[in-house]
Design a protein with these regions (language model features):
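Post-cleavage N-terminal segment of exported redox proteins
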Residues: 1-9
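Short Fe-S-cluster ligation motifs
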Residues: 49-74
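Extended surface/linker regions that mediate inter-domain or inter-protein docking
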Residues: 69-178
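Short secondary-structure junctions and interdomain/linker hinges
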Residues: 40, 44, 57, 61-64, ...
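Cys/His-rich metal-chelating microdomains
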Residues: 28-29, 161
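Flexible gly/pro/ser-rich segments immediately N-terminal to CXXCH heme-c attachment motifs
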Residues: 9-24, 32-49, 141-152, 168-178
């Protein structure tokens, strides 16, 4: 056998550097890329990245269950989805999660993700551009408030340009690596 030795220190793989790092050497490719919907296939949630409405009647999504409705709200530059449920105890119960990541360019629609510790989950309400309204996220049952759908690495392979999975079998990621 051969024994290969090197005097160079091999570094660990680089983290995501973003498309702007390519701009100087590849300006045409960079300009073309930033004009595509894929350029904004996933990004942090803010007033510019979220396509839906947060005021008036457009901030609500009603379900076939007359005891459940969703409200989208904005507070202090953060955006939330809240399930409002009339319980058996005749009291209003709320479950609210912050929209932290937007997936989808908004050309067709968007769905939203949130962190719970180091795990990533899909929120139950998405935005459909053709109607300009909030809808159930794909595959979510109408009339139920489901906040525990994990977002696995296979989802992120298509819906993010770069994402560091800490556990490929589950929905565990490095939040600072997005």
């Amino acid at each position: 056998g051969h024994n290969l030795q090197t005097s160079e220190q091999i570094s660990s793989p680089a983290a995501y550097i973003g498309p702007a790092a390519c701009q100087d050497c590849h300006p045409d490719k960079y300009q073309g890329f930033i004009q595509t919907a894929h350029h904004i296939t996933s990004r942090l949630a803010d007033a510019q990245s979220i396509a839906g409405h947060f005021t008036g009647d457009a901030a609500f999504m009603w379900t076939r269950n007359d005891k459940l409705w969703f409200e989208m709200s904005a507070r202090d530059d953060e955006f939330y989805q809240t399930a409002n449920i009339w319980g058996e105890d005749n009291k209003l119960h709320e479950h609210s999660e912050r929209m932290e990541i937007v997936t989808g360019s908004g050309k067709i629609g968007q769905t939203y993700l949130y962190w719970k510790n180091d795990r990533l989950y899909q929120l139950p309400i998405s935005y459909w551009a053709a109607s300009g309204k909030w809808i159930n996220s794909p595959g979510y049952p109408d009339g139920q408030a489901v906040f525990d759908r994990p977002v696995g690495p296979r989802c992120m392979e298509c819906h993010a340009t770069y994402f560091a999975a800490e556990d490929y079998e589950r929905n565990v990621y490095g939040q600072g690596e997005f």
